[in-house]
Amino acid sequence: MRQFLDVGTGLPTADNTHEVAQRVAPDSRIVYVDNDPIVLAHASALLTSTPEGRTAYLDADLYDPEAVLKAAAGTLDLSRPVGLMILNTLGHVAEYDRARELVRRLMAGLPAGSHLVISDSTATSEGMIAASEAYNASGAVPYYVRPVAEIAGFFDGLELVEPGVVRVPEWRPGPSDGVEAAAAVDAYCGVGRKP
């Protein structure tokens, strides 16, 4: 995989998608998508590329998948596989069916061999449910936690990559990742390949 579409990227931090991808393959192309003006300001300053690759930022909205794909085609070759990343973003879409439809429309514009990566907080503990309710009552942009089965439903029609839909720290853990950390995380993730 040499092309990545990171939808709902949020504020740049350490080891952003382009840094990790271009460290492994300097010719990788990455497109970040968000609609937050604060993210845009930081992205413009911090998201640079290797000379061999390309990194771009789109001021675009998850709710318009076709416009996202059209704009991304300025940097990515959409006739070749793309890694679509939607990390901790779908929780902002209140209606589950609408969230699934947005994912389906994005994947429909990508060729066979593309991969979908999703992670989101889940309604797997009373503490997380209470925290979500308090956050949503605060006036912030709401974030809805979902059952694990709904996270898994985003991958319908795709070939799940092992180990499937699991808690984030359990997805290919490194030698220093402990079971204790996994037990404390109310976020699940998965990777699916478009056949």
Set out the residue ranges of the language-model regions.
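Conserved class I S-adenosyl-L-methionine
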Residues: 1-12
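Residues at the N-terminus of the alpha-helix immediately C-terminal to the conserved SAM/SAH-binding loop
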Residues: 13-17
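Short coil/turn segments at secondary-structure boundaries
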Residues: 9, 31-34
